[in-house]
Structures are given as C-alpha cells and as structure tokens.
C-alpha cells in the first residue's frame, strides 16, 4: 500500500513488490504490504493484517500497533526504537526496500554531470520554474520527483553525481553507486533521513537551501502584503540559491555507502522476502 501521491518515492511500491514478490501481490490471501515510504503512522487502516516490509515512521502521529501487525523489517534504527517503545518488542531493521532497484535495472551510460532532485513540495507553479531556470543556468539536470518511477531511476543512474532534497533520490543514487549530497529546508523531515542514513552507516549533514516554495508562488488567495513580501524574498533568494547550488555541484564531500554493505543489505532483504512468501503460501 501507499498514499495517493505523484511522488516517485512512494510509487516505487508499484514496481518493486510485483517484481520480487509477484505471487504475494497476486495472492487472494488477506492483508496488505506496508512497504517503501514513511507509512507507519496514524493513517494506517486499523483493520486487516499488515505486513511491514521496510517501511518507516516519519509523518503524522504514532501508529496503533496491535496483533494485526507482522513486522519483517523496518527502514532503520530510529523506526525500530519507536516500535520497541510502542510494543516493548525488538524489531529488525535492514534498510529501505528501494535498495532492491539495483537488482532490477541496469547501470546506465552517464549523460549528466550533476542532477538535482527537489522535494515533491517544490513541484508547484512558480517554484518549479525558478528551480528550472537556476538549474539550466548551472548546467544541472533537474529531475522531477513526479515523473514515472522508472524514468527517475534511469536519470539518476545516468548521473555522475546527485544533489537531492528527496530522500529516495539519495537512496536510489546510493543503490546505483552515484555519489550524492543531501539538501534540507523547512518541511523536509529530519527523522526519516536519519533513519535511513543510519541503516547504511552514513552521516546526515544536509545543506540548508535558502528558499521556500511559497516565495515563488503567485496565489491570488494570499493577502497582497504577504504576496509582496514573498515576491521580494524570492527575488533576493534566487541569486543566493544559484550560488549555493553552484558551490555544492562543484564541491567535494559527496556520500556513498560501502558496496559490501549494500550487497549484504540486499541479501538480508531477499532472505526476509523468501520467508514472507513461504508464510503467505502456507
């Protein structure tokens, strides 16, 4: 399951689980897969079995965990700690299930020196045009997180380096061996990033971008004084944002997890998926 969204990270569930567990996805057995994304919260349906395959906490209120939960693994240690506090039981963490994309798609020939992946909240009229203008002026490939998941994966694989506000931009880049840098701004959750980076023994030290999407939007329902203030802020921030992204693109200190650890995590997930399929078939 996932929430109705255009964000490619959440939609990875649509391609990964049918590939690695087709018999489970086609099964009439009761229950739902709670997989990729920050899905463990109060919005989860209370009825029915829930099979947790690498999901994490990060949005909304804490979930009500009951006997209908079957946790195979969670995204990272922070989610595991939260579930232990809620249930009194230990739960295994491995990493985000998007790591399995490396087993599905080939490595692509490089086309882009640096790609930028904004958070899905930046895909709004005004903000997206501003980011496009800045990226084009710097020779940076701008990847929309609202493209089809396979298209996003392909462009990331075609990149030599990735700068990303989107968590799954970093996860996919890391999976394909593409060095990456994390970005932060208001509205981007710290918890889910730390949860995943900790699972891969990586630091989380994002660069804070000097913008808010509202500064570039032109919403007539917003009072005129606030619209004016936003417009001024956008005019001031645009050259600052351009310089900041230029420095990040040309700088050092890119992240990439240990390749042996990636292989080990994939093997652990395959082991859990085999156990899951046997349980469903029994």
Report each predicted region and the residues it spans:
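Active-site anion-handling motifs in enzyme catalytic cores
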Residues: 1-282
């Amino acid at each position: 399951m996932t929430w109705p969204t255009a964000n490619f990270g959440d939609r990875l569930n649509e391609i990964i689980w049918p590939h690695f567990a087709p018999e489970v996805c086609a099964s009439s057995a009761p229950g739902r897969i709670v997989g990729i994304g920050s899905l463990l919260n109060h919005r989860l349906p209370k009825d029915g079995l829930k099979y947790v395959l690498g999901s994490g906490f990060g949005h909304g209120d804490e979930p009500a965990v009951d006997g209908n939960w079957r946790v195979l693994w969670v995204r990272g240690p922070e989610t595991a700690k939260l579930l232990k506090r809620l249930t009194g039981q230990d739960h295994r963490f491995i990493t985000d299930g998007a790591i399995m994309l490396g087993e599905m798609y080939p490595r692509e020939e490089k086309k882009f020196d640096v790609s930028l992946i904004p958070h899905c909240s930046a895909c709004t009229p005004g903000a997206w045009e501003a980011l496009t203008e800045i990226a084009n002026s710097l020779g940076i490939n701008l990847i929309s997180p609202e493209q089809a998941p396979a298209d996003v994966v392909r462009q990331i694989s075609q990149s030599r380096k990735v700068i990303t506000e989107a968590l799954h931009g970093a996860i996919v880049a890391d999976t394909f061996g593409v060095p990456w840098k994390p970005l932060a701004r208001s509205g981007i959750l710290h918890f889910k990033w730390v949860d995943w980076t900790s699972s891969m023994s990586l630091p989380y030290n994002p660069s804070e971008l000097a913008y808010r999407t509202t500064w570039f939007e032109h919403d007539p329902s917003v009072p005129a004084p606030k619209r004016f203030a936003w417009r001024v802020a956008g005019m001031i921030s645009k050259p600052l944002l351009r310089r900041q992204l230029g420095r990040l693109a040309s700088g050092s200190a890119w992240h990439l997890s240990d390749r042996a650890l990636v292989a080990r995590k994939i093997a652990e997930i395959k082991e859990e998926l085999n156990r899951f399929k046997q349980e469903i078939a029994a």
